[in-house]
């Protein structure tokens, strides 16, 4: 049983959904970034979704673009990111760790090389934001060869065919979008999700975690009630880093409080 399967089985026993925060590694700097990841897990995060800083994050709204800029300004490289993941992995052997990256980053030193690094660091899954299922073959094959789950996005506008492909090709979990567009807490999550979930279940998709625009406990509760296996919160988590970056102590406390309130909302 891999880490995601073990997590979902465990949560099912407790009658809970998963709460998964997203942060960009190296935001606001590599040292504090490690403390942030540690704080998120200690405060109740069931898994982590991590970004490797990239200079042109297309699918991200201004909040996460800001995180990328801060991380790059603090000289965070992919090598530093993998070091930090390795460190977190050795402290938390069972917590699933997913990466959310862009194709250029995977291509940079060769696809196999990228997935080898993921495997060595203890990464469980990789979602490549700008690679749709029909262009995913070489990434997917390399991921699977290295024991990494390829994650695919199920958008709200998806046709039954797309959902079936996402269900068939994905592993670990399915990233279910609560709305189309760029990420951000500003636009409230619109939730036509029950229908999408029903479809994905028909096609035997990996458990669906709802992302995009999830910024408060009520939305987590709603996602879990609708039948999602959990919720991912990116912009709202990153916004706290942006607000408190000058005061590490206040920053870690704000993240811990936010995480524990979001996690509490996953109880069915």
Curated annotation (Swiss-Prot):
InterPro entries: Aldolase_TIM (IPR013785), RibuloseP-bd_barrel (IPR011060), Trp_synthase_alpha_AS (IPR018204), Trp_synthase_suA (IPR002028). It comes from Aliivibrio fischeri (strain ATCC 700601 / ES114). This is Tryptophan synthase alpha chain. NCBIfam families: trpA. PANTHER family: TRYPTOPHAN SYNTHASE ALPHA CHAIN, CHLOROPLASTIC (PTHR43406:SF1), TRYPTOPHAN SYNTHASE, ALPHA CHAIN (PTHR43406). One of its GO terms (cellular component) is cytosol. The active site is at 49 (proton acceptor), 60 (proton acceptor). It comes from the Bacteria. It catalyses: (1S,2R)-1-C-(indol-3-yl)glycerol 3-phosphate + L-serine = D-glyceraldehyde 3-phosphate + L-tryptophan + H2O.
């Amino acid at each position: 049983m891999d880490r995601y399967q073990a997590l979902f089985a465990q949560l099912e026993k407790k009658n809970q959904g998963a709460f998964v925060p997203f942060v960009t590694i190296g935001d606001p700097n590599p040292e504090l970034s490690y403390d942030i990841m540690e704080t998120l897990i200690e405060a109740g995060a069931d898994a982590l979704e991590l970004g490797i800083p990239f200079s042109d994050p297309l699918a991200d709204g201004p909040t996460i673009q800001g995180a990328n800029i801060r991380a790059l300004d603090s000289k965070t490289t992919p090598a530093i990111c993998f070091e930090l993941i390795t460190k977190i992995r050795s402290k938390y052997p069972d917590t699933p760790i997913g990466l959310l990256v862009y194709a250029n980053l995977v291509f940079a030193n060769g696809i196999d090389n990228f997935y080898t690094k993921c495997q060595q660091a203890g990464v469980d899954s990789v979602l490549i934001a700008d690679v749709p299922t029909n262009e995913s073959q070489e990434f997917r094959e390399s991921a699977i060869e290295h024991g990494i789950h390829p994650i695919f996005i199920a958008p709200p506008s998806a046709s039954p065919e797309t959902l079936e492909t996402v269900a068939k090709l994905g592993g670990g979990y399915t990233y279910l979008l609560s709305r189309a567009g760029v990420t951000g807490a500003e636009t409230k999550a619109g939730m036509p999700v029950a229908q999408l979930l029903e479809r994905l279940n028909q096609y035997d998709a990996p458990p669906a975690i709802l992302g995009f625009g999830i910024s408060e406990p009520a939305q987590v509760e709603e996602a879990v009630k609708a039948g999602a296996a959990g919720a991912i919160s990116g912009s709202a988590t990153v916004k706290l880093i942006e607000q408190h970056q000058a005061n590490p102590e206040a920053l870690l406390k704000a993240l811990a409080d936010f995480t524990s309130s979001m996690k509490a909302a996953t109880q069915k």
